[in-house]
Amino acid sequence: TLFEKHKSLGGMLNQGIPVFRLPRRIIEKEIEQITSLGIKIELNKSVSSSKEIEKLSNNFDAVICAMGTLKPNILNDDFSKNSSVENGLNFLLRVNEKNNHYIGNNVIVIGGGYTAMDCARTALRLGAKSVKAFYRRDQKDLDILPGELEELVNEKGKMIFKARPNTLINKNNTLEFLELIKTKTKKNDKKIVDIFNSKFKIKTDHIILAIGQKQEFKTTKSITNIFHAG
């Protein structure tokens, strides 16, 4: 039995990665191979706590947990509570699975990995007038596929390095600017530090945070028939 929390199989391959980067026919072929094995599938079935997993272990010979890392890293309460700020995975999920194509005019993406690139390029395709991605490290530290940065630039997106988000600037309870700080890498220990008196602001009405994720929960007991596979 396979429990899937979304309305379709495929995980982040299907719900997260944009169609322009991974054609759905490839995923559909793999799903067909799985379903042809006679596996029982329950869609829209969420297993959302360690207690639920432990309960399943009493009803099945073995439980394999392959839920990924979906809990987004956050900056602070100002960012997490602002309705104009959303995390990258939620953004991709609502676009790819829920068909919700809302996008701001001046979009800022924070991050330097696959998700950040996917969010920036998706925002451009949705019609954003301006898309700027900010990464606190240097270009050589990007964790992306070869050619992705060039594709973003060719699509009229921008990538700005050595800058990190600092403060949201609102006007009449509406997001108007993001204040950032320029950064540098210390030579001795490669630590990222702020550059003194280097704050600057960028106009924005929509911020997408793609700064990594972590596991939502894990089993608290050592149970012999529970296995973790990703």
Residue ranges with predicted function:
Residues 17-22, 60-61, 81-83, 148-152, ...:
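Short, hinge-like loop/turn segments at secondary-structure boundaries
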